[in-house]
């Protein structure tokens, strides 16, 4: 192939355009973008970029932009590039690895990495030998460029490097990288270590056979003069502990001793990575035996790590700052918490018990087991500036992505995790005396503050062992709420929230009154951080104390109203959460004129002051949702005000959606539009829960049935979840007004019975069940399609408990609609159905489900026979059935007993003894009742 020759006029034109990138003008950048778009029609456009990028006689910013545009083009258009252009880039880019400009070398590394992502090593056979050879060069620039490139390849192409595609390059590469552990250049040592560390999890054979040399190399760098090297030594050891601890076990005592030393390193980055080791090893098998002897040394180190540094104090201690407006970057975006019907939330995740004490903002949490924050990120990634900004994270090799994670937080987390591993008596015998010493009033306030943080950190893991001490600890903490230092008051609020469970129990009940009084005082503190911590702590107390707070309602509401006049934007979000949590736990107790007259006016004032496009309206609507649900009819004429505003918000947001939809991507929606729709739908649901069937009078004068259908046709999981939840509630109270759209609703609901979107699936299933028992004729044509999806879901036994319960209820209700369509398949789901429904609280939903299941089983008793023990277990889960339902199942069970004749006794004796006792008592299965 003839050598490529550029057109000089075209080259000059492109250089001119790239040179404009030095401008700070947005208009100029738009012009650059337009001009570069025109170049895409030139087949060898990327050859020009490559040529400009490698030309060291050009100005650095021109070369830099050429390289970044080339990288972007490879990411987006590589497959469309002519093969000769691809080959030209590969051939010409490698020599630039020795460029004296480090930023140019790093751009080369990113280009190479993206080329391999888009193809493979076998299509560029010269690459790895060239990089390997470069490591033997006398040029420091070439070695650095090659090591940097290899670190990116090891991170992004781990599997490709350990494959035939690369010619098993790791067999040569890993030993050579280990040799760099001894070189004089600290940056080279670091890059070599980082590169190999990416293979620890996959553990290729090339690393396995060199593991002894690798470990010796790591240990040889443990006292490295470079902070960056020591940081990555600690990071590598943490990765080994987390994933391959067996390789460290022969050296584990030395490793632990080293980490004890490194956790106190003068370098904050080294100390932070070392501190992560304690959480990692705490989760390893047999960790108690490994760590037991070191607790007396480790715990003091961790406690010291929890003390605020002077820099922290200067940044955080803002004194009386309640009148200082929040900066926009201080305010987290509000995420609407959309409702998931059922007794279990959609997440079903295990709570580790540790809550970040330095981030008390729970405003995005409705603190409700029935609420699931369904954060559907409709991010419209704007890549307009990607060509001019190297925002790729390819070269982020420092390993620290979360700037907010500190030694203080890591130490507190380790203290927390350790408390759950060791027996309470053993752990507290070491920890409590140290904490008590630090609580002494003679100590500097940062030391006392760290002791209070430690008390909060161990609250859950050492719960039983701490109980005898709480009668002394809690009064101390309540008194400390009045400490002159804001950071002490703040952490005390958090720690008390960790013990609110005990205060709500009989043993701690005497402390409820002083806690409420003092915590309310802190809610209106003059320091914003204290306000935040106190408000969050009070929301936690509300959940634990529940109805015990009823005597304090007036005092609480007066404080909340005072806070409205004092809080800046960020803390208002937390205040809304505390109000909605209170409304949830005390329920209709709020429906008293004297309480309504305190709480509602400030909420109403804000409701009227905010226009429909103001995002500050979103958290307010979330708060009103629960307030309306609890107060209900007591809102009187405000009910129609809230209802009509919600309808208006939905209409406006849908119009904005359709406008956006016509202008941009079909089927997508602005996340802002969907946020308002979700908040308005949820407020309507709160109203319906509060006033019940009275909401029917509002429907005829609105177009809610059609609006709801439009919302259900949107794609966002959050808006679907809220739409389905509202439809379920409307089905309970006034379904007749929605009748004309039932077939459309059911089509959409059926198509969303997929557990990949758990809360959407959950609410769809529940809504179908609510419609089924009220309009069975309309549901009947859909039974077969719904049945198939629900049977599939009920057999996914690892699904969230609430989802399984709702699925079981809806299957049972479909049995009322059309038992003949369900009964032939009873053998496929009855066992899982029984296991799900037996855990459900006795209520009207469970009642209707059992009525439908009775019809299903009666239609096909033989199909259910081999699962009779599960049926009996489910029936026995009732405390008290309705008389007619009891009679039906009494006869059903005795029908099975009679049909089995002489084998019944042998079969029945295989039932668990406790189950037989219940069945004998309630259903007389041990007696002959034949006449």
Swiss-Prot record:
Q: Which cysteines share a disulfide bond?
A: none
Where does the UniProt annotation locate this protein?
Answer: Cytoplasm; Nucleus envelope
Give positions of region: Disordered. Answer: 317-401
Q: What GO MF terms are annotated?
A: nuclear import signal receptor activity; nuclear localization sequence binding; small GTPase binding
Q: Which controlled-vocabulary keywords does the entry list? A: Cytoplasm, Nucleus, Protein transport, Repeat, Transport
Low complexity bias located where? 358-381
Comp. bias (Acidic residues): 382-401
| Stretches assigned to the Importin N-terminal domain | 32-99
Write down the PROSITE patterns for this protein, in alphabetical order.
IMPORTIN_B_NT
GO biological process: one example: protein import into nucleus
InterPro entries for this protein: ARM-like, ARM-type_fold, Importin-beta_N, Importin_beta
**Pfam (any one):** HEAT_EZ
From the UniProt record, list the HEAT repeat ranges: 10-37, 42-79, 88-121, 127-164, 171-201, 214-241, 253-280, 296-421, 430-459, 471-498, 512-545, 553-586, 594-632, 640-693, 704-735, 743-776, 784-819, 827-860, 869-900
GO cellular component labels? cytoplasm; cytosol; nuclear envelope; nucleus
Q: Does the keyword Cell membrane apply?
A: no
Q: How does it assemble?
A: Forms a complex with an importin alpha subunit.
- Family in the record: Belongs to the importin beta family. Importin beta-2 subfamily.
Described by its record, this protein's role is as follows:
Functions in nuclear protein import via a substrate-importin alpha-beta transport complex that passes though the nuclear pore complexes (NPC). Mediates docking of the substrate-importin complex to distinct nucleoporins.
Q: What is this protein called?
A: Transportin
Q: What's the source species for this entry?
A: Dictyostelium discoideum
């Amino acid at each position: 192939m003839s050598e490529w020759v550029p057109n000089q006029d075209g080259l000059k034109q492109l250089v001119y355009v790239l040179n404009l990138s030095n401008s700070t003008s947005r208009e100029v950048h738009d012009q650059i973008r337009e001009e570069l778009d025109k170049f895409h029609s030139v087949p060898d456009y990327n050859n020009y970029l490559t040529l400009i990028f490698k030309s060291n006689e050009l100005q650095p910013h021109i070369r830099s932009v050429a390289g970044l545009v080339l990288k972007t083009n490879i990411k987006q258009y590589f497959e469309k590039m002519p093969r000769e252009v691809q080959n030209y880039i590969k051939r010409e880019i490698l020599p630039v690895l020795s460029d004296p400009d480090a930023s140019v070398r790093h751009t080369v590394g990113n280009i190479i990495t993206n080329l391999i992502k888009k193809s493979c090593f076998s299509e560029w056979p010269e690459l790895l030998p060239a990089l390997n050879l470069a490591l033997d060069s006398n040029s420091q620039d070439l070695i650095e460029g090659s090591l940097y490139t290899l670190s990116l390849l090891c991170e992004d192409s781990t599997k490709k490097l350990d494959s035939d595609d690369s010619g098993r390059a790791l067999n040569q590469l890993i030993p050579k990288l280990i040799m760099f552990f001894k070189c004089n250049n600290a940056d080279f040592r670091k890059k070599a270590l980082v590169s190999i560390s990416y293979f620890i999890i996959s553990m290729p054979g090339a690393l396995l056979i060199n593991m002894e040399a690798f470990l010796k190399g790591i240990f040889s760098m443990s006292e490295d003069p470079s902070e960056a090297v020591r940081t990555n030594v600690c990071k590598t050891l943490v990765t080994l502990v987390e994933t391959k601890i067996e390789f460290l076990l022969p050296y584990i005592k030395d490793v632990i001793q080293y980490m004890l030393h490194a956790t106190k390193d003068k370098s904050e980055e080294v100390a932070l990575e070392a501190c992560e080791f304690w959480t990692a090893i705490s989760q390893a098998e047999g960790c108690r035996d490994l760590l037991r002897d070191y607790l007396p040394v480790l715990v003091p180190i961790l406690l010291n790590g929890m003390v605020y540094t002077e820099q922290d104090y200067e940044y955080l201690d803002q004194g009386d700052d309640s009148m200082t407006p929040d900066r926009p970057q201080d305010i987290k975006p509000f995420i609407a918490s959309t409702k998931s019907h059922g007794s279990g939330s959609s997440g079903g995740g295990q709570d580790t018990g540790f809550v970040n004490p330095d981030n008390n903002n729970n405003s995005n949490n409705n603190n409700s087991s029935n609420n699931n924050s369904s954060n559907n990120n409709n991010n419209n990634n704007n890549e307009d500036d990607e060509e001019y900004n190297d925002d790729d994270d390819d070269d982020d090799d420092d390993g620290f992505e979360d700037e907010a994670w500190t030694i203080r937080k890591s130490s507190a987390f380790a203290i927390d995790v350790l408390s759950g591993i060791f027996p309470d008596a053993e752990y507290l015998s070491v920890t409590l005396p140290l904490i008590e010493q630090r609580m002494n009033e003679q100590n500097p306030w940062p030391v006392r503050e760290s002791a209070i943080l430690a008390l909060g950190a161990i609250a859950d893991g050492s719960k039983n062992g701490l109980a005898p001490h709480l009668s002394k600890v809690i009064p101390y903490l309540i008194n400390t709420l009045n400490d002159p230092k804001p950071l002490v008051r703040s952490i005390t609020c958090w720690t008390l929230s960790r013990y609110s469970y005990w205060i709500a129990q009989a043993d701690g009940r005497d402390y409820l009154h002083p806690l409420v009084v003092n915590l309310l005082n802190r809610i209106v503190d003059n320091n914003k951080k204290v306000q935040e911590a106190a408000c969050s702590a009070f929301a936690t107390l509300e959940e634990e104390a529940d109805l015990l707070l009823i005597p304090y309602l007036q005092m609480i509401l007066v404080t909340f109203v005072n806070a409205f006049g004092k809080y800046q934007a960020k803390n208002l979000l937390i205040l809304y959460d505390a109000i909605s949590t209170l409304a949830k736990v005390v329920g209709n107790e709020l429906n008293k004129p004297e309480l309504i007259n305190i709480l509602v006016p400030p909420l109403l004032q804000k409701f009227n002051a905010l226009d429909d496009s103001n995002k500050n309206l979103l958290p307010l609507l979330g708060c009103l949702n629960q307030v309306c649900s609890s107060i209900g009819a007591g809102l009187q004429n405000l009910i129609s005000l809230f209802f009509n505003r919600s309808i208006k918000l939905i209409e406006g947001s849908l119009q904005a959606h359709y406008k956006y939809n016509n202008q941009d991507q079909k089927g997508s929606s602005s996340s802002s539009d969907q946020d308002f729709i979700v908040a308005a739908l949820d407020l309507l649901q709160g109203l319906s829960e509060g006033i019940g069937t009275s909401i029917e009078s509002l429907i005829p004068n609105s177009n809610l049935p059609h609006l709801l259908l439009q919302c259900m046709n949107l794609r966002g999981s959050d808006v679907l979840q809220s739409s389905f939840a509202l439809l379920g509630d409307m089905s309970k109270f006034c379904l007749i007004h929605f009748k004309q759209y039932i077939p459309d609703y059911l089509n959409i609901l059926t198509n969303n019975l997929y557990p990949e979107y758990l809360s959407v699936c959950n609410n769809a299933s529940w809504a179908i069940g609510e419609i089924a028992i009220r309009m069975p004729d309309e549901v009947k044509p859909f039974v077969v399609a719904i049945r198939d999806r629900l049977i599939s879901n009920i057999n996914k036994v690892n699904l969230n408990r609430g989802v399984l319960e709702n699925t079981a209820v809806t299957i049972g209700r479909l049995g009322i609609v059309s038992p003949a369509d369900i009964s032939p398949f009873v053998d496929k789901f009855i066992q899982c159905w029984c296991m799900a429904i037996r855990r459900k609280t006795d209520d009207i939903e469970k009642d209707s489900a059992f009525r439908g299941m009775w019809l299903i089983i009666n239609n096909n008793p033989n199909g259910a026979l081999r699962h009779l023990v599960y049926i009996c277990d489910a029936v026995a889960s009732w405390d008290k059935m309705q008389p007619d339902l009891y009679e039906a199942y009494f006869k059903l069970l005795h029908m099975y007993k009679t049909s089995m004749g002489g084998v019944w006794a042998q079969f029945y004796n295989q039932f668990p003894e406790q189950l037989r006792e219940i069945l004998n008592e309630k259903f007389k299965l041990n007696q002959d009742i034949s006449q």
